[in-house]
Design a protein with these regions (language model features):
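Helix-loop segments that flank and shape redox-cofactor active sites
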Residues: 7
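Histidine-acidic metal/acid-base catalytic patches
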Residues: 10-159
Length: 159
């Protein structure tokens, strides 16, 4: 079982969020110590909270991360809002993050554990996607493939 962070990580309409930061995850994951009680590490959801250090969150819970969504965001100048960006152009340093992920996967492989499943999250709507009759916002085929190719390029470059 994996727990995805609140998306977005801020209260909406006065309804508080459940899990948006290191402290929230620590409370939940420490409440029942099991590899089955894990985290869906969503870089976009976590990075959209300006108080989060996603690299520290990853390092803290790396053994409990069961799935990864790779998405990038940019915090607005007002520090109160954010928007999604292309995978390589936001505030998240994907080279740094992917190095951490690969290091953890290497550790797991020594212990005969599986790789961490991951995927690009929320690809952008590119020209070809705009003419499709039915698209799911954030899940366009070509936009996600572009994100996947960028992420695979980083993996290849740092490996």
């Amino acid at each position: 079982m994996t727990l995805h962070p609140d998306d977005p990580p801020v209260a909406l309409f006065g309804i508080p969020k459940i899990v948006s930061n290191l402290k929230d995850y620590k409370f939940i994951l420490d409440s029942y110590d099991s590899l089955s009680n894990g985290m869906a590490f969503c870089s976009g959801s976590l990075a959209s909270n300006i108080n989060n250090n996603i690299y520290k969150i990853f390092e803290t819970f790396k053994k409990k991360i069961n799935f990864i969504h790779l998405r990038n965001v940019k915090i607005d100048k007002d520090k109160k809002s954010f928007y999604e960006t292309n995978h390589l152009s936001g505030d998240v340093d994907f080279v740094k993050l992917i190095k951490l992920i690969l290091k953890e996967e290497k550790r797991r492989s020594k212990n005969k554990k599986v790789e961490i499943p991951m995927r690009p999250d929320h690809g952008h709507c590119l020209l070809d996607d705009q003419f499709k009759k039915s698209i799911n916002p954030g899940y366009t085929a070509i936009g996600r493939m572009m994100g996947l190719s960028e992420l695979r390029g980083i993996i290849k470059a740092v490996s």
